Amino acid sequence: KKLIDFALEIPIEFDGCNFTNSLYAIYHARKNLVNYRKDEIISRAIQCLNHSMNHKIKGSGYSFHFKSCQKNYYTQKVSNGGNQADIHGTGMFSLGIVIALKLLGDFAPKGSEYWKYIKT
């Protein structure tokens, strides 16, 4: 319960990692607490799904930052930036979308069953 409380109290920073990390923590913490703060969790999932579209690049993937691909990965420069998709943003937002859809449960839209959370 404390982890769910903590995750819901923190405002989401909408970049690839923070977006997904928030949902990931809630998803795993609520496995045995399905009804705990359920409405707030559903609200958070919807908020994340709606915001993820701000990072979607038409005809491509997702940009890690709003209107900017990731410039550095840890200490290495990986691009000059720009409003384009990048592999890290696409991977993290795809995972975040899957988790958000799972958190919606019965409220998930039709077609969400095709989004899978695959553990490797």
Residue ranges and their predicted role:
Residues 1-120:
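Terminal, non-catalytic domain-edge segments
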